[in-house]
Structure formats: structure tokens, C-alpha cells
Amino acid sequence: MPAMQLVAIRQFLGGILYVAYFLFQKTPWPKAKQWKTILILSLLNFVLSNGLSTWGVKYISSGLGAILGAIFPIWIVIITFFRGERLSKLAVTGMLVCFGGVCIIFYDHLKDFLEPNFTFGIILSLIATLTWAFGTLYTKKKAASFNPYFSLGLQMLISSLFLFIVIGATGTTIPLSEIPANSWWSIGY
């Protein structure tokens, strides 16, 4: 099953469930100015981060994927530093120790960084973690004024529509009837 189609279906179904729950609870819709934030977060956290991450792991080993995913907090430190904000030395040390721990656990996969066949997957995964970091920082800055879970559902729904457009335009889909059972189980999970 095409990875982006899997992501689009998973986010669509998850978004529908979240949004339906909050509509049933009569949660007020976000205000007009909040939709810009929701749209930006949809693109950063779901279309780019989740979509590119899922696409990227098709081209790399799982251990390398774990190492690349663990780079996410380091991006936070780097971005925060260049914004002129301060992080405590303890926080930075903790992130580096955790990243080092992941590298120790997946030590055998460090050599995969040198594998030419993995270059595309590495690039996709790095962009995914970088957009995840920007999305996280943007969430911290902008998203506190409305229900984060309702926003999450809307982000999932909006991002799935973007992804359906992309996979439709690129022809990277298969009919729903041809999706294997294990893919449906992973979507449900």
C-alpha cells in the first residue's frame, strides 16, 4: 500500500472521530483568527512531519529511522538557540544524553548514514523532524487559546484532505478494496 495513502486514510479517520466527538459535545468552533494557526499546524505537524516521516521510513532501516526520529529534540534546541531564547543546561544535557542513548541502542545502524541507497529516506526523515520541531514550537506559541484536542482533530482532517490531493495528483493510490488487511489493522491501530 502506498505510504502516503495510508497516512491520508489514517488522518482522515482519526480527524473524523475527533471532530465528531467535539461536535457532539457542542464544543464551539475555532474563531476566524484561529483557523490560520490550525492550517499552519496541519501542514507542519501532519502533512510534512507525519507524511514525510512515513514516506522516509520506506527508504531506510528501522534503526536509522529511530535515530533520525530522536533528532527532533535537538532541532528544538537549535531553533530555540537561533531565536535567542535560553534553554537550561540541564535540559540540553538531558536531550543529548537521550539522543546518545538511542544511538547506543541502535549502534549497528549508525553506519546506515553512509549507505547511498538511504540518502532519500534520510533527507525526508530530517525534513520531517525539522517540521515537527517547528510545529511544536508554533503550537507552544500560538495554540493555547483554543481546545488543543479539537484543534488536533481539525488538523488531522485538514491534512488528510491535502494528502488526498497530493496522492490523487501523483497517482500513488490503490483502490480501497485492494488495501491489504494488515494495512487496515495498522490504520486502526
Give the residues covered by each predicted segment.
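Residues that mark transmembrane-helix kinks and helix-interface sites
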Residues: 19, 50-54, 74-77, 106, ...
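Cytoplasmic-side transmembrane-helix entry/capping segments in multi-pass membrane proteins
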Residues: 33-42, 87-100, 121-122, 146-156
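Transmembrane alpha-helical segments that form core, pore/gating elements
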Residues: 3, 18, 76-82, 95, ...
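Specific alpha-helical transmembrane segments that line the substrate/conduction pathway
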Residues: 5-16, 45, 50-89, 128
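Specific transmembrane alpha-helical segments of multi-pass solute transporters/efflux pumps
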Residues: 19-69, 104, 185
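Membrane-interface helix-cap regions at the ends of transmembrane helices
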Residues: 13-31, 100-115, 158-183
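Hydrophobic transmembrane alpha-helices of multi-pass small-molecule transport proteins
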Residues: 18, 39, 71, 87-109, ...
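Residue-level signature of transmembrane alpha-helical cores of multipass secondary-active transporters
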Residues: 38-42, 54, 66, 95, ...
